[in-house]
């Protein structure tokens, strides 16, 4: 709505603006012929016109006697009036129309909800489901490959067999010398209360179960087994000391070498013969 202060004088106001303001003045005959602008559509509803008014050309506008009369009365206001008319039209165009905005807003959601047709939407959903199923199939195939039993190497098979055979790890039992076994039996027979199973196990650093089996066993080796065992242990003794001699280790001298039977029996004769 235009402000009254910005309006020109009533003589310079055209018919269109007067119809907006509701002012109806008697117009001259020449004014009907040379009208400034065509009537507004809103005004045509209230005051229908018999014919559609066309805007005046520049030549007709300059030769109109009524307009010349108004220009002579107000020489400085024609430019202002034309500028105010243009500004009023621009303001009317720039004013937001609530009906038009509501129509636009009501139509936009429908467009946004269904931006694509049924065919494109079906294709989109189909491609999306295909991608999802393809990803699931790929993941399933990877999991199947991981779950499938792989071919083991020979060393892996041996390792699994050892783990199954020795779940607690490699812990071989301590093997005692046959003479030691005889000593254990002899001590237990001499004094069972003193040389008990826990005491003997702690003394020889074996388990009580091993001492119990040694005492329970009544097996005695034959002469042939004793001779074979003695040879085997002598070979083992020589092999070990030969390996130590190669790296520069000398054999340890026994603490009781001076009290051996040979020295006691034949030591005096050797000393006497030597003198």
From Swiss-Prot:
UniProt keyword Mitochondrion present: yes
Domain of life: Eukaryota
Cellular component GO terms held in the UniProt record: mitochondrion; nucleus
Polar residues compositional bias, start-end: 77-88
Signal peptide: none
Pfam families: Neugrin
Ranges of biased composition (kind: Basic and acidic residues): 89-103, 141-150
Region: Disordered, residue numbers: 71-154
Protein location: Mitochondrion
Organelle transit peptide: 1-42
Keywords tagged on the record: Mitochondrion, Transit peptide
Entry's family note: Belongs to the RRG9 family.
Protein function: Required for respiratory activity and maintenance and expression of the mitochondrial genome.
Annotated protein name in UniProt: Required for respiratory growth protein 9, mitochondrial
Source organism of this protein record: Paracoccidioides brasiliensis (strain Pb18)
Encoding gene, per UniProt annotation: RRG9
């Amino acid at each position: 709505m235009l402000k009254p202060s910005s309006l020109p004088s009533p003589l310079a106001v055209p018919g269109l603006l007067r119809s907006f303001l509701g002012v109806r003045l008697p117009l001259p005959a020449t004014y009907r012929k040379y009208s400034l602008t065509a009537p507004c559509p809103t005004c045509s509803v209230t005051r229908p016109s018999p014919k559609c008014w066309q805007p005046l050309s520049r030549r007709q506008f300059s030769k109109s006697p009524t307009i010349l009369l108004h220009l002579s009365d107000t020489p400085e206001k024609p430019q202002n009036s034309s500028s105010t008319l243009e500004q009023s039209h621009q303001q009317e165009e720039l004013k937001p129309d609530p009906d038009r905005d509501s129509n636009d807003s009501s139509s936009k959601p429908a467009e946004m909800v269904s931006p694509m047709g049924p065919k494109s939407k079906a294709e989109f959903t189909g491609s999306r489901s295909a991608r999802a199923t393809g990803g699931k199939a790929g993941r399933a195939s990877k999991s199947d490959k991981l779950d499938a039993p792989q071919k083991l190497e020979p060393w892996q098979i041996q390792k699994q067999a050892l783990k199954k055979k020795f779940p607690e790890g490699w812990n071989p039992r301590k093997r005692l010398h046959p003479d030691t076994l005889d000593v254990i039996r002899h001590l237990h027979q001499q004094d069972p209360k003193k040389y008990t199973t826990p005491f003997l196990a702690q003394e020889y650093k074996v388990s009580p179960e091993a001492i119990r089996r040694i005492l329970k066993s009544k097996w005695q080796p034959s002469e042939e087994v004793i001779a074979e065992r003695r040879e085997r242990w002598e070979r083992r003794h020589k092999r070990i000391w030969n390996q130590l001699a190669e790296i520069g280790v000398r054999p340890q001298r026994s603490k009781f070498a001076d009290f051996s039977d040979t020295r006691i029996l034949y030591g005096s004769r050797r000393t006497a013969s030597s003198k």
